[in-house]
């Protein structure tokens, strides 16, 4: 069995995360870690929260990055908060000064992520609490397509605010004002409580905790 020091020279670190989380959050950490530990082989497995958590439980990944996991048996550390909002293309036929109700938002042609996305499930549950069922016109597997299709005027997209800042700053899309605020969530760094992390996983997590604040 490799010693802790040897693991930091020769080990492998497998991380599960969505493409969006990898590009938005993880990339600088991966770059720094690779520079500090060039002998460790980094493997990134792409998947939504449910998939990477399943892989964590099966031992296929060492660390999973998932949205507000509520499953038992996990050690979690919150990396950053996320907020669900609604946007439309800057030329879309709506009143960007109007403050929309939940029902008015639901009445738009909606562009949402597919149902297996945790953010979609959370959004639907929030609207159901108000007695409103969301029936999107378009369902997508890609977050980037939400912005692309909203930009060309196909409808109002439900997006994560933190992931669409560039499109908002460029003016391609605009926020719709609402009289409600959807509760925030977080992207968490997750490991199994009853499994000791490898030296590589411990070093990576320590770096994230130190530098993400």
PLM ranges: what are they?
Residues 94-95, 109-130, 197-201, 205-206:
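Secondary-structure junction motif
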Residues 12-16, 64, 87, 111, ...:
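Short, well-ordered beta-strand segments
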Residues 1-6:
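Alpha-helical linker/hinge and terminal dimerization helices associated
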Residues 48-53, 57-60, 67, 124-176:
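Hydrophobic hinge/microswitch elements
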